[in-house]
């Protein structure tokens, strides 16, 4: 006998438990951004800081160019 409401309920419940456990495991095992940064070696921290600074500079430059182009129009 295939199918039946009991089999569907058991399958949905089992699937929900597996998905819920996987989500909980993901949330507890994955470090947040600050924890990941704190675990880096000093050399890698310097590289990350330099990259963040470069990214911030390029974003500021893009904003300035955008404002200048708006003034010209």
UniProtKB/Swiss-Prot annotation:
Keyword annotations: Chaperone, Coiled coil, Membrane, Mitochondrion, Mitochondrion inner membrane, Transmembrane, Transmembrane helix
InterPro entries for this protein: Cbp4
Region feature Disordered, mapped onto this chain: 47-73
Disulfide bonds: none
Membrane topology: Single-pass membrane protein
Presence of the UniProt keyword Glycosyltransferase in the record: no
Cited Pfam families: CBP4
Location(s) in or outside the cell: Mitochondrion inner membrane
Biased composition, class Basic and acidic residues, residue ranges: 57-73
Gene Ontology CC entries for this record: mitochondrial inner membrane
TM region(s), chain numbering: 11-30
Keyword Heme: no
Similarity comment: Belongs to the CBP4 family.
Protein role: Essential for the assembly of ubiquinol-cytochrome c reductase. It has a direct effect on the correct occurrence of the Rieske protein, core 4, core 5 and apocytochrome b.
Protein's name in the database: Assembly factor CBP4
Name of encoding gene: CBP4
